[in-house]
């Protein structure tokens, strides 16, 4: 049986070539088929086909030839049932007849009606291997149309369409013993302009089936749809069809869980009180009106930073940050820190300390993100003058979208803070509550927030200016290792496309992370840092200022030798005694980073022709 079907050839195979020339349109079926069947199907032709084992092929061609020899008027009147209303002929051709409809054509029992000028493939039943071999020669082999012209098999015939991911098969109601199946074949290389009602002549409109595609076919492949299943036609979803492809910048909401000032004036920003070095939770979420919708593109990167509230030039801001850093006990002291709480790491990833005053991380807008941050600088730490009002500070959050191909954030918000030391925030709140309770309502000139309405949650205020880029601070002491300076924040979207470990690297990355091209290799000339010490002997009350020419142990020896007439070559050891009583050997690192403008009591001891110096911290 298998050998018998292997010897049979297909009746008609037209390859679906992408460059196949467009055939001219015919106004009638008779003209189309008669132009195709130019030579009559003689008995000799049938005999030759029978000798080659193509009885079915000869029968099929005879069916088609005899069918189109019948006049058009007789065919139209013969296929119309008497009990139905007359309807346009194109609806007859594009629908599968019911079981009760009987064909009245004497030339044969099977009919295959195909849209004119559309390539298609016809193969014999059970010749799956033959169909596979021929599909390998087609230009667009992702769709194969199989039409049975013999007795309808009892199993399901399916046409798999790989690009759409579903199979289109003959409906179960069509499986009956009467082999009267008709299949409508569409060529996807046709555009919707060819099917529009405004550009087609009346005759072409009458023969054209409705299409559920709203856009031009994009692939030159075939698709098969039965009339009852045309509703299954679904265009592929492109990136522009996503519900949430581009992140909207107006739907983000950030909150800080900290105490707010009770003395809020109308129109002013909310003042939040923080304790220096204490961690406070910051919550980030996307407050879209379409709640419950899962956004397919949902990763964003946010940068939390401490910035100055007042408008200052970039040079002034860097000068204030450098002064603050020079007053710290360690060069690694940061302006803002993030806690490694498990609650935080479950909602964020890719945490990077991109600067001393900024931290960036990635989070999913489908979920709520929470981070714990601490601020390590006071408002009064930026000036050497005592008793002056400190500089106001802001916590600012910039959010960048994955699809944002620029350095401009999609959303920016801030809240004004005032940082206290040693639980000063709680004392400030209690002091305001006490003053508010003593003040009479009639004497109040500014509207105060009632104490019973006070909450510990501050909502960040949106900032409309998205063009001004904040200043990132990176101390000069790290230039020798990192070869980078303080510059303006610039986060490219390429950084958002990958996710690494929780702490991707630490505390800094490469120049590419900031969107700044690597600088040319120039010799960096920077002035040596000067160190000033205040020293006095135990018997003295006034301090002497020791200015070290070089911030090193050798520079300290030279300064002491010049000031106290101690021979430089006879100085043996120099010790530093901390306030805790710890005695350590003085070295270059301590002199350079931990001794500037500190006060010491100097003790000089002579033993064995050498001097031992001890600097006791006061």
Swiss-Prot record:
Cellular localisation: Nucleus
Residues the record lists as Phosphothreonine modifications: 208
Coiled coil (residue ranges): none
Post-translational modification note: Methylation at Arg-9 and Lys-116 may be involved in regulating transcriptional activation.
PROSITE patterns reported for this sequence: GRH_CP2_DB
Annotated function: Transcription factor involved in epithelial development. Binds directly to the consensus DNA sequence 5'-AACCGGTT-3'. Important regulator of DSG1 in the context of hair anchorage and epidermal differentiation, participates in the maintenance of the skin barrier. There is no genetic interaction with GRHL3, nor functional cooperativity due to diverse target gene selectivity during epithelia development. May play a role in regulating glucose homeostasis and insulin signaling.
Subunit structure: Binds DNA as homodimer. Homodimer, also forms heterodimers with GRHL2 or GRHL3.
Family of the protein in this entry: Belongs to the grh/CP2 family. Grainyhead subfamily.
Protein name: Grainyhead-like protein 1 homolog
Annotated organism of origin: Mus musculus
Lineage, highest ranks first: Eukaryota, Metazoa, Chordata, Craniata, Vertebrata
């Amino acid at each position: 049986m298998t050998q018998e079907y292997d010897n049979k050839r297909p009746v008609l195979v037209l390859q679906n070539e992408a460059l196949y020339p467009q055939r001219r349109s015919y106004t009638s079926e008779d003209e189309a088929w008669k132009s195709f069947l130019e030579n009559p199907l003689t008995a000799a032709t049938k005999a030759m086909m029978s000798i080659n084992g193509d009885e079915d092929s000869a029968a099929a061609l005879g069916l088609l030839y005899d069918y189109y020899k019948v006049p058009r008027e007789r065919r139209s009147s013969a296929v119309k049932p008497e009990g139905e209303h007359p309807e346009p002929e194109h609806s007859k051709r594009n629908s599968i007849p019911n079981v009760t409809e009987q064909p009245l054509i004497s030339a044969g029992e099977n009919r295959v009606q195909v849209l004119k000028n559309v390539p298609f493939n016809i193969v014999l039943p059970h010749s799956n291997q033959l169909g596979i071999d021929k599909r390998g020669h087609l230009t667009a082999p992702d769709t194969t149309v199989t039409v049975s012209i013999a007795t309808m098999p009892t199993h399901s015939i399916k046409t798999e369409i790989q690009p759409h991911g579903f199979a289109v098969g003959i409906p179960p109601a069509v499986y009956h013993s009467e082999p009267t199946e008709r299949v409508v074949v569409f060529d996807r290389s046709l555009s919707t302009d060819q099917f529009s009602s405004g550009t087609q002549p009346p005759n072409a409109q009458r023969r054209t089936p409705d299409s559920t595609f709203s856009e031009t076919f994009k692939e030159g492949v075939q698709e098969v749809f039965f009339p009852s299943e045309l509703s299954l036609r679904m265009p592929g979803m492109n990136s522009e069809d996503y519900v949430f492809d581009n992140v909207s910048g107006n739907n983000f909401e950030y909150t800080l869980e900290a105490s707010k000032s009770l003395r809020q004036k109308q129109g002013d920003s909310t003042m939040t009180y923080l304790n220096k070095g204490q961690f406070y939770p910051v919550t980030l979420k996307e407050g879209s009106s379409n709640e419950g919708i899962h956004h397919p593109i949902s990763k964003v990167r946010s940068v939390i930073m401490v910035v100055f509230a007042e408008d200052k030039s970039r040079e002034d801001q860097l000068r204030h940050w450098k002064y603050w850093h020079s007053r710290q006990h360690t060069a690694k002291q940061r302006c803002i820190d993030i806690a490694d709480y498990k609650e935080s790491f479950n909602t964020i990833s890719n945490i990077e300390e991109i600067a001393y005053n900024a931290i960036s991380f990635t989070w999913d807008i489908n979920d709520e993100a929470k981070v714990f941050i601490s601020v390590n600088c006071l408002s009064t730490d930026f000036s050497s003058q005592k008793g002056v009002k400190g500089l106001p500070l802001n916590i600012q959050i910039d959010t960048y979208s994955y699809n944002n191909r620029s350095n401009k954030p999609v959303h920016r918000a801030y809240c004004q803070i005032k940082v206290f030391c040693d639980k000063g925030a709680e004392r400030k709140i209690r002091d305001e509550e006490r003053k508010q309770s003593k003040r009479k309502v009639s004497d109040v000139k500014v509207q105060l927030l009632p104490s019973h309405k006070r909450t510990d949650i501050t909502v960040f205020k949106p900032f409309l200016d998205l063009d001004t880029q904040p200043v990132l601070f990176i101390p000069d002491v790290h230039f020798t290792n990192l070869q980078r300076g303080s510059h303006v924040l610039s986060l490219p979207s390429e950084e958002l496309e990958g996710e690494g470990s929780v702490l991707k690297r630490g505390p800094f990355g490469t120049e590419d992370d900031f969107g700044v091209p690597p600088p040319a290799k120039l010799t960096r000339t920077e002035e040596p840092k000067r160190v000033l010490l205040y020293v006095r002997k135990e018997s003295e009350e006034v301090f002497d200022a020791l200015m070290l020419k070089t911030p090193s142990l050798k520079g300290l020896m030279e300064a002491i030798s010049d000031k106290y007439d101690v021979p430089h070559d006879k100085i043996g050891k120099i010790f530093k005694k901390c306030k805790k009583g710890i005695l350590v050997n003085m070295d270059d690192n301590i002199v350079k980073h931990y001794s500037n403008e500190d006060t010491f009591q100097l003790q000089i001891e002579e033993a064995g022709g050498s001097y031992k110096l001890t600097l006791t911290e006061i």
